[in-house]
């Protein structure tokens, strides 16, 4: 008869039984898998459906655990546990999502002037265009009536943009717009602080970001942050001025962060260095300029320049070492502390608590939270007195983080962190007491300090720190003491060398294992990253960051941190300037990614050489993958989702070009850097031509970033000779009559005429119009062409015949100035793409223009509702929308009337 041993019985020793460790692994894996499946939902179920999943799964798990000893067959029992736990993960995550989604902004409140009262709950972000902040809403009124808003909203208080009642008047791009959108300087934003209560008039909209293949999911990021509406403060002269109602200390950490950031910028004159220090101390990544981010990414050290999981983990490790050292030294005064709690345990728990405080001061962002939960799980398991194998420690930490933050599974940082930790677990030495966050489990008597109480020899004493000082001072003679000092010195040097060797090997292992994953997630990897990190990791973590943090207590230390950062910055800039500093590959499918990660892991593991060599062929799919291209004689047009502006990629069998590059959002951000560069990298494109239709900022804003990424591309445009882009790359004029052929596809410029350059008028009138045809299907890209130019094209018999197209880029985003009836009658497209921003201030495309398209049975695709739009000459009867292809429930569904 089996003898009961807690949860484990002798019967469990049979290979056909469900052993507790295997059962736990099945439960954890199932839970994570269930969460992952739920995150693939395009739409949420009813809330009661998720409740049913939870109740059913919990009931089944209860029965399984109660009757676990009767499950004699291993795999059926494990599969059942996996399935039930997956159902639990699916149901719990769906329930949380449905509860959260119920508080979303009512679409009827979008674009309305709402009077809100609330409290600033996070450190405001100040920029060149104003200030951005988060407001916890306590009350809201619309036209005197109470309305319900999401608990937390993100607002911008901008200078230089506002509204006022006025007569309809022209705007700079030649369009006319409703009077409520006339431009006017707003009241300058006031200095906001966390904890302050404000009353203000705001205009809100649902969270809406750009939706592009392989692009950043802004809506998911806001979902994770708990933001369910974005908008701006109405602060023009015709609006009631925002009113500060008072201050409170309900957010002291955020107020302290803001004060420290202001002190850093007041002390450090170099704004770039000040931004880096602010990022390291208070987690303000927005303080780092884009040019610096480009250098950090090119050298593979971007993870160091913000408070990331690495910083928090290193901080916990260092803090645990210091606390353990102090704990041991306390025995010189009294052994009470060491007898009450071993030094290793004190260091582990103390390091965790201090790391949590560091993460809190860094803003308690979602990545920081994940790191703390992971560290907490590891510490609890390592200090539990049981010898957990590393896969179980890793898996339990993974499950805890996923349970607390399910949407972390969709974030690149999550996978990089856990793969790195898993690789270090798998390739490192066995866990032991040298691990400051863990340590070997101590015998029960040792944990009580029994050996020390019995006066045992130091070698057999527990790692409490109590025995070491007493035995040290009780050793007899002076000569022996000197010899011991020499031995300690030699041992110390040997330990330093050993630690450096271990650190170098771990960096190499991480680089090797994460390279395939980085290529999958970012389509780019730094070839100089190993060298850069070998210098930057110890320098930033052991020199720059401690000095920057100590500067909070004594400001002159920020001067030393500045010098240390400047030296590192110069070295990184030199490495980034190397032509071979980075390598980019096209985005590979999931099977390639899995193979690549396995290949990297095999190469990094402590295995015989012939086993590790198997990792090389597994890496090849990631490195050599090329996306499918149009066949010879075919072409495709991809309209990127870039907001208010134009940006399209045209591809043939072996060539490609970009037509316009979208808007410039701010001094540090534009559509080229945000959208086009990542998209071109993911597609594996080296473009032949960049054509800029005309000089308006919503068409050329991203050009510098695209040109920097594509040094081989020719620049063709209608910009004037003195334009600043001419200094970046000399532009060729686009002229009617120009033509070329790629892979059986003909390209022809229809506008402007040479005479237009002699007497240029409005920039829109100079738009380059490009016709693309394979003899069967045709696309027409019309820029911001206006009525006069449209009619001129229609009036030319030769040109009119060539206007007929299957696909049309709507001229001027659907403005009243364009899309005349005769022009549409000549083009006769099946599809027309209107690239415009969601709820843009020009109301593009305007309803009267859309009516003209409807009258002619032309399907208008609007980018806010479609995202990136792809049209292919091989399938001319349909347009593929990114928002439909990759739909997830947290993404914004655009109401047609609101576009």
Task: Identify what each model region corresponds to.
Residues 19-66, 411-414, 557-605:
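Membrane-embedded alpha-helical segments of integral membrane proteins
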Residues 72-96, 608-631:
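Internal/C-terminal transmembrane anchor helices
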Residues 2-20, 76, 85-303, 450, ...:
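Membrane-interface helix/helix-cap signal primarily in integral membrane proteins
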Residues 34, 118, 413, 514, ...:
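Residue-level signal for inorganic ion chemistry
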Residues 2-83, 100, 121, 192, ...:
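Accessory, non-ATPase domains that flank or precede helicase/AAA+ motor cores in DNA-metabolism machines
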Residues 249-267, 276, 284, 292, ...:
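Hydrophobic alpha-helical segments of integral membrane proteins
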Residues 169-176, 189-190, 194-201, 214, ...:
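Non-globular, low-confidence helical/coil segments that flank catalytic cores
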Residues 26, 231, 284, 288-439, ...:
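Hydrophobic alpha-helical transmembrane segments in multi-pass membrane proteins
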């Amino acid at each position: 008869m089996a003898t009961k041993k807690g949860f484990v019985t002798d019967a469990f020793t049979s290979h056909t039984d469900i052993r507790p460790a295997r059962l736990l692994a099945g439960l954890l894996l199932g839970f994570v898998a269930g969460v992952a499946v739920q995150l693939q939902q395009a739409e949420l179920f009813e809330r009661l459906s998720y409740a049913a999943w939870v109740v059913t799964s919990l009931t089944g798990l209860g029965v399984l655990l109660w009757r676990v000893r009767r499950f004699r067959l291993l795999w059926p029992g494990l599969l059942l546990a996996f399935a039930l736990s997956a159902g639990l993960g699916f149901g719990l995550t769906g329930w949380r999502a449905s509860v959260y989604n119920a508080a979303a902004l009512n679409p009827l409140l979008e674009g309305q002037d709402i009077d809100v009262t609330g409290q600033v709950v996070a450190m405001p972000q100040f920029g060149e265009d104003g200030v951005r902040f988060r407001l916890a809403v306590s009350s809201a009124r619309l036209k005197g009536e109470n309305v319900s808003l999401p608990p937390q909203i993100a607002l911008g208080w901008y200078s230089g943009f506002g509204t006022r009642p006025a007569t309809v008047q022209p705007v700079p791009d030649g369009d006319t717009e409703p009077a409520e959108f006339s431009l006017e300087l707003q009241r300058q934003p006031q200095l906001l602080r966390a904890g302050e209560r404000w009353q203000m008039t705001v205009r809100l909209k649902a969270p809406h970001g750009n939706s592009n293949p392989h692009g950043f999911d802004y809506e998911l990021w806001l979902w994770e942050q708990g933001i369910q509406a974005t908008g701006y403060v109405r602060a023009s002269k015709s609006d009631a001025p925002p009113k500060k109602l008072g201050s409170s200390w309900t957010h002291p950490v955020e107020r302290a962060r803001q004060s420290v950031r202001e002190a850093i910028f007041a002390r450090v004159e170099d704004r770039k260095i000040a931004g880096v220090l602010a990022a390291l101390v208070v987690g303000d990544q927005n303080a780092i300029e884009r040019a610096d981010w480009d250098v950090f990414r090119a050298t593979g050290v971007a993870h160091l320049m913000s408070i990331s999981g690495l910083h928090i983990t290193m901080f916990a490790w260092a803090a645990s070492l210091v606390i353990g050292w102090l704990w041991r030294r306390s025995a010189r005064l009294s052994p009470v502390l060491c007898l009450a709690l071993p030094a290793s345990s004190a260091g582990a728990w103390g390091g965790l608590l201090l790391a949590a405080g560091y993460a809190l001061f860094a803003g308690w962002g979602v990545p920081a939270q994940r790191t703390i939960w992971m560290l907490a799980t590891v510490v609890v398991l390592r200090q539990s007195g049981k010898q957990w194998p590393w896969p179980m420690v890793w898996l339990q930490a993974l499950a805890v983080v996923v349970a607390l933050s399910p949407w972390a599974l969709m974030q690149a940082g999550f996978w990089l962190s856990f793969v790195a930790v898993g690789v270090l677990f798998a390739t490192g030495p066995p866990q032991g007491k040298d691990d400051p966050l863990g340590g070997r489990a101590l015998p029960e008597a040792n944990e009580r300090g029994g050996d020390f109480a019995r006066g045992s020899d130091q070698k057999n004493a527990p790692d409490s720190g109590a025995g070491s000082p007493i035995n040290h001072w009780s050793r007899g003679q002076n000569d022996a003491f000197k010899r011991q000092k020499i031995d300690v010195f030699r041992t110390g040097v040997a330990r330093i060398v050993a630690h450096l060797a271990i650190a170098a090997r771990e960096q190499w292992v991480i680089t090797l294992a994460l390279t395939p994953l980085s290529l999958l997630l970012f389509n780019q990897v730094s070839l100089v990253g190993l060298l850069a990190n070998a210098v930057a990791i110890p320098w930033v973590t052991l020199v720059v960051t401690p000095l920057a943090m100590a500067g909070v207590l004594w400001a002159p230390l920020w001067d030393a941190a500045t010098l240390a950062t400047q030296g590192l910055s110069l070295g990184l800039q030199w490495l980034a300037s190397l032509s071979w500093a980075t390598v980019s590959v096209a985005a590979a499918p999931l099977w390639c990614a899995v193979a690549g990660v396995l290949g990297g892991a095999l190469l990094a593991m402590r295995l015989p050489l012939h086993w590790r060599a198997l990792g090389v062929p597994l890496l090849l799919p990631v490195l050599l993958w090329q996306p499918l291209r149009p066949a010879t004689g075919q072409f495709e047009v991809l309209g990127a989702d870039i907001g208010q502006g134009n940006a399209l990629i045209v591809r043939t069998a072996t060539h490609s070009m970009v037509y316009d590059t979208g808007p410039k959002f701010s001094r540090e951000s534009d559509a080229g850097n945000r959208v086009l560069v990542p998209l071109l990298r993911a597609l594996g494109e080296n473009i032949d031509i960049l054509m800029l239709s005309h000089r308006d900022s919503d068409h050329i804003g991203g050009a510098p970033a695209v040109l920097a990424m594509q040094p081989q591309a020719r620049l063709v445009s209608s910009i004037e000779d003195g334009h600043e882009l001419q200094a970046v790359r000399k532009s060729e004029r686009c002229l009617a009559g120009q033509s070329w052929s790629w892979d059986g596809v003909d390209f022809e410029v229809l506008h402007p005429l040479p005479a237009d350059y002699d007497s240029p008028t409005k920039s829109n009138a100079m738009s380059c119009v490009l016709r693309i045809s394979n003899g069967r299907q045709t696309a027409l890209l019309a820029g911001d062409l206006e009525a006069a130019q449209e009619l001129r094209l229609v009036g030319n018999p030769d040109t009119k015949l060539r206007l007929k197209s299957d696909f049309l880029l709507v001229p001027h985003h659907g403005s009243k100035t364009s899309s005349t009836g005769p022009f549409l009658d000549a083009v006769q497209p099946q599809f027309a793409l209107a690239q415009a921003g969601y709820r843009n201030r020009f109301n593009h495309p305007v309803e009267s223009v859309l009516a003209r398209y409807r009258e002619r049975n032309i399907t208008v695709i609007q980018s806010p509702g479609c995202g990136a739009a792809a049209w292919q000459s091989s399938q001319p009867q349909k347009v593929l929308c990114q928002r439909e292809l990759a739909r997830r429930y947290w993404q914004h569904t655009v109401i047609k009337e609101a576009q």
